[in-house]
Curated annotation (Swiss-Prot):
Superkingdom field: Eukaryota
Cell compartments where the protein resides: Secreted
UniProt organism field: Cydia pomonella
Entry protein name: Cydiastatin-3
Entry keyword annotation includes Transport: no
GO biological process, one term: neuropeptide signaling pathway
Modified residues annotated as Leucine amide in this record: L8
Keyword annotations from UniProtKB, A to Z: Amidation, Neuropeptide, Secreted
């Protein structure tokens, strides 16, 4: 959903 989709 986030524009910077990391696996955090």
């Amino acid at each position: 959903s986030r524009p910077y989709s990391f696996g955090l």
